[in-house]
Amino acid sequence: MSHVQLDAIGYHLPDGRALLHDVSLRVGEGSKTALIGPNGTGKTTLLRIIAGDADPHDGAVTRGGQLGVMRQFIGSVRDDSTVRDLLLSVAPDRIRRAAEHLDRAELALMECDSEQDQIKYAQALADWADVGGYEFETQCDVHTTAALGIPYELARFRGVNTLSGGQQKRLVLESLLGGPHQVLLLDEPDNYLDVPAKRWLEERLVESPKTILFVSHDRELINRAAGQIATLEPTRAGSTLWVHPGSFTTYHQARADRNAKLAELRRRWDEQRAALRDLVLMYRQKAAYNSDMASRLQAAETRLRRFDEAGPPEAVPLRQNVRMRLAGGRTAKRAVIADNLELTGLTRPFDTELWYGDRVAVLGGNGTGKSHFLRLLACGGTDPELDQLPVGDMIPEPVNHDGRLRLGARVRPGWFAQTHHHAGLMDRTLLDILHHGDERRAGHGREQASRILDRYGLAPSAEQTFSSLSGGQQGRFQILLLELMGSTLLLLDEPTDNLDLHSAEALEDALAAFDGTVIAVTHDRWFARTFTRFLIFGEDGKVRESVEPQWV
């Protein structure tokens, strides 16, 4: 029977800090479980332990059924491996070993072509057939045709680094979901996928008979595909795990109820311990003057010792207190005016007016000009006023265009870049960036900068360089800079892509309170539903408005 069972897993980092503490989970046959949690709580480490890539320091892992694994780096492969190499990397062990044997035999035959090499090559071909190698190649043809639109014979030696992140993900997902593995571990399978591909993934996960544990930050995917949600939550003893046996729509209330119950249990435990301790102190004082109290003192001490040995109830998770404060400010009623605007080679001419206070989601397929539109706005438009020009470390590249794009009075753009790539930030520490201001934001002393970083959950990373941060940390820091710049027009390019669920929800709360205009490019369907206007960038170059999200 295919399943995954974790019993009291513990894991320590090289510096001795506990990462995972008493983690237990069962993923039953055919079930789909989403693994979520804040960045740094150990989600990928837990998958590595289940896969056998890392050993737990405490507890045990049991698995039933053949295991297939999609690791986190799929989608960002930039080495010289081929499509064949990628498909073999997620194939069953017997296929992978037989392929390596066949490759060595073929290379030896090409170099020498002796009778012995011919015999070895013939044996390697026979072994390849015995393990189902030719059937594997037939399946590869199905997978490359579905993911890349070309047969395996044409795709097999193509470099993986020539594929987009979405193509790499789709190819591996096709192989794993259509392969013989009964248990799948998928680390962020939705990253790099556009919305149609995410919908495809949802359908495949739901209809698959396989046992699947997947890590994701996509709330729509989790809500549609997961039968249960396992949450890694930080405590002082390390991350613990809680399982919600329902969908994401009921998750928050269930989590709030659970945390309230844990807090109440802890309050009662503290009260009981305080009462027992007071009892011991009372009998100790009396026993000092009355020997008849000695037995009562001993009984009270025994009760306190046994109470302590039983230990406190499960700890309440540490609060993930990310607090974003995007203030904004009043601007002209017409915040953005596009007049016969054409992004060269990307869109046809279009007109639009965006008003102060609008919440506009920019939707469409990859390569349709969405990010270019945001970048042109970040440059201040066609003829920017002095206070609308980009400054400091956040200067975008110019955008070729015809027509006009104007910003209204007092509209000061603040830009969140999709790639998080700002040359002026990369090799500087967070404290240094905050200490040295620019034309739009004041510098801050060490103590004040530390307080600001703490609100974004970045205080422990204060001395790290921007380039060394995780994608989620870089995202939070970019939002922090927008807060300090006093922007009245927020331009957000895929802001939730690398944010954990808690940070994404903190951003949504901050945007709801923001006094200004927000324009965001996004493929996050859950996030998009918080907007009220939608600009759709079509594959045909047309830009149109919609009253509801439309996904190509």
Curated annotation (Swiss-Prot):
EC number(s) from the headed UniProt entry: 3.6.1.-
Species name: Mycobacteroides abscessus (strain ATCC 19977 / DSM 44196 / CCUG 20993 / CIP 104536 / JCM 13569 / NCTC 13031 / TMC 1543 / L948) (Mycobacterium abscessus)
Residues engaged in binding ATP: 37-44, 364-371
Stated induction or repression of this protein's expression: Expression is up-regulated more significantly after exposure to macrolides (erythromycin, azithromycin and clarithromycin) than after exposure to other ribosome-targeting antibiotics.
Disruption phenotype: Deletion of the gene results in increased sensitivity to macrolides.
Entries under CDD domains matching the protein: ABCF_EF-3 (cd03221)
GO biological process, one term: response to antibiotic
Superkingdom, natural source: Bacteria
Cystine residue pairs: none
Protein family (similarity comment): Belongs to the ABC transporter superfamily. ABCF family.
UniProt protein name: Antibiotic resistance protein MAB_2355c
Domain ABC transporter: 4-270, 332-552
Pfam families: ABC_tran
Regulation: The ATPase activity can be inhibited by ribosome-targeting antibiotics.
Alphabetized UniProt keyword annotations: Antibiotic resistance, ATP-binding, Hydrolase, Nucleotide-binding, Repeat
Reactions catalysed: ATP + H2O = ADP + phosphate + H(+)
GO molecular function: ATP binding; ATP hydrolysis activity
Role, per record: Exhibits ATP hydrolysis activity and contributes to macrolide resistance by ribosome protection. Can also hydrolyze GTP, TTP and CTP but to a lesser extent than ATP. In vitro, rescues the transcription and translation activities affected by macrolides. Increased expression correlates with increased resistance to clarithromycin, one of the main drugs used to treat M.abscessus.
